[in-house]
Amino acid sequence: MLTSLDRKLIGWSAAFVVSQTLVAKVLGPTAPRVLEVQTAWSAPRYRKVLASMDDADIVRYRSHYYLDMIHPAIFGVALFIGGRRLGQITELSPVTRAALAAAPIVAASGDYVENFVGLHLLDHSEDITDTTVRTTSAIS
């Protein structure tokens, strides 16, 4: 029998899948660039990835950020509910419970930081530094 949390988890997980699918659809053929940007550990590499995109790619890339402003909240709620449900079906230490409660907030916050920085860097290439790129890559 499904519990209330099970139903919420199913609903928020479905919302996550829909959200991720929409982000991928908006990105289209530009999707691989996201991973390249997220794993660029230097300013020259970051600039090279952005320079490899044509105008249409940049439009798609920029557009994905707006959908990705909703996505972290969705996956954060799904993860939080999943952690609560896990605590209902198995014994968890207080430390584990606290970690499971904090992890979705930390993960979503990191995604928001990555999104805001990524959007900023699209229009402010002078701010693309090794420190900014490495910090953002570590957060993402």
Task: Describe these PLM feature segments.
Residues M1-S140:
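Short amphipathic, positively biased membrane-proximal segments
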